[in-house]
């Protein structure tokens, strides 16, 4: 039962799953995973919430706790992907990649604001910058103004000083012990952890 807020992406994913697993019944549900969703669960059958990738890191710890607690009400088991804490140099290289993939992703926010909200951002006047904040345990993504200028958004105008940043995104990292503790606070008792050989990423199996 795949869930996504984008109907087009959801339908494409559901079609792909159906092709790859023809014996699997795929029931797509359009919704925001951060809010309660009415999911048709068949009684008597075990349910597992699968939250792959490292999306949970885009939530604050408080939001992650709320999401885990909400999911526990849907299923007694979860599989959750978590990006682990690691050498800050590795994190810096990943979020400031030489190919510029992350920079393009971050700068695309300005294009979307222009298109969807009618602003007049010039992406050429900003550069991408990301760094690890050890006190908060997170990567912070920013867009840095390359020069002093102003931007119009609706009836408002916002002035940027050279070097001023727009804080666009956070990506929280956890140690295995930290995430196990967070899951326990959300009501999950049993925890299994699988990691890659380098200990960069983990899959947590949670049982309520």
Tell where the protein language model's regions lie, with residue ranges:
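Short amphipathic alpha-helix with an adjacent loop that forms part of the alpha/beta core around
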Residues: 36-44
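Substrate-binding/catalytic lobe of Class I Rossmann-like enzymes that use SAM or dcSAM, i.e.
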Residues: 92-176, 180-186
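Core SAM-dependent methyltransferase catalytic element
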Residues: 143-145, 196-208
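A short linear hydrophobic-aromatic micro-motif
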Residues: 189-193
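A conserved beta-strand element that flanks and buttresses the S-adenosyl-L-methionine
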Residues: 50-51
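Class I SAM-dependent methyltransferase SAM/SAH-binding core
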Residues: 1-35
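A short, conserved alpha-helix within the catalytic core of class I
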Residues: 57-75
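Conserved beta-strand signature within the Rossmann-like core of class I S-adenosyl-L-methionine
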Residues: 73-88
